[in-house]
């Protein structure tokens, strides 16, 4: 494995990883929020500041959040409950298979870990035939 793959993740890695997955484009959703989509279905969204996601240290809205789809509630809980990871959730996402992360904290995971999480997010939204072909090429 190269150093570029095992280094700390950066916000720029999000675009590189997402756009490196099959049939992904950067579009928008929920208005004009930049969203990585596979065949029109979003799997990573840049979330705008809002009153439902406040920084507990300042009481101010987070300004650099990503919403990342996860396969299911158990995957969500595993990411949120691991104290070594920067992922979290808010009441607004109760019952929804997604986690949030501040882009400024992406360096707390490796690029490889981020790639795995974003690939899993892509797999949640990719059509079955595309998933199958991707996994077969694995």
Predicted feature locations:
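Charge-dense, helix-prone N-terminal extensions
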Residues: 1-138
